[in-house]
Amino acid sequence: MNRNARFRQKLQDPALMHAMSAHNPLAAKLAAEAGFDAIWGSGFELSASYAVPDANILSPSQHLDMMRAIAATVEAPVIADIDTGFGNAINVSYMVPQYEAAGVSAVVMEDKTFPKDTSLRAAGRQELVRVAEFQGKIEAACGARRDADFCVIARTEALIAGAGEREALARAREYEAAGADAILIHSRQSTPDEILSFVSAWQGRVPLVLVPTAYPQLRESDIQALGKVGLVIYGNHAIRAAAGAMRDVFARIRREGGIHEVDAVLPTVKEIIALQGDAQMRELERRYLK
C-alpha cells in the first residue's frame, strides 16, 4: 500500500490521525521520529522561515521544493498547504499534478481570495470567494490528480471571516458535493465553542479536519470523542518551537559570554550528523568508494 492509500485509509479510520507541521526536511524527520502519522507542509512556517508574512509572498515553486524535499526524507504521508491554490481553477489544475509528482499525499486548499492573509492575524483581511468559484477549484483539483487515493481537502474560512456557522455549514456541504475528500473547519476563537457547534451540526459523509492552534485546551481525547474528525493538524508548532529555542539559546550565549554553559543542554554535533543521514552515506562509501 503506497503513502496515498495509507493516508486515505487512515483519514477514514475511526482512530484520529495526527499531523505535525514542518518547514524543512529536518523538522519533518523529527516529527516522524516523534510518532506523528503525517506531516503538514505548512505555508505559514515556510513564510516564517523566510521572515516574510504568510500572504502568498513566496512563490509556489518555493513551497513545492519544500514539499519534494520533505517527501523524499520521511516515510509518513505529506499534506501540502496550498493556500488558495495559487490562483484560479486553472492554476489549481496545473499545480496539483506537480504536488502529486513531488510525493505529496494530499492538498489542503482554502476558500479565500488570492492573495490571502494568514487566518490567525488580528484584524487580518479575510475575504471569501464565491461558493461556485471554489467548487470549480475543488473539481479542478480532483480532475487533475492521477492517483485516485490522492486526497483533496477543502478548507472553509467562513468562521474566520465572521460569516457564521450557517454559512460555514452551507459551504462545507457544497464543497463535499464538489468532490472534497474532507472538510477542514478553521477558527481563531480562543475557546473551541464554535468548532464544537459546527462539528455537532455537521451531517456530511466526509470526515472533518481540525487545527486547534487558537483553542489548545481541546485535547486529542476530546477530538476523538466527537466522532466526526479524521485528522488533527498542529499547524505551526515546529517553527514556534524552533524560534523559541533559538531565541533562548542566543540570548544565553550573549548573557553568559560564550557557549561554555549552554552547550551542555544542546543536541550534540554527533546527533545532528546522525539526523543528516550519516549512516546511509557511510554505507554508500563502504560499498562504492574503491
Mark where each language-model region is.
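Extended, intrinsically disordered, low-complexity segments
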Residues: 143, 238-290
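Alpha/beta enzyme core
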Residues: 2-213, 217-233, 247, 251, ...
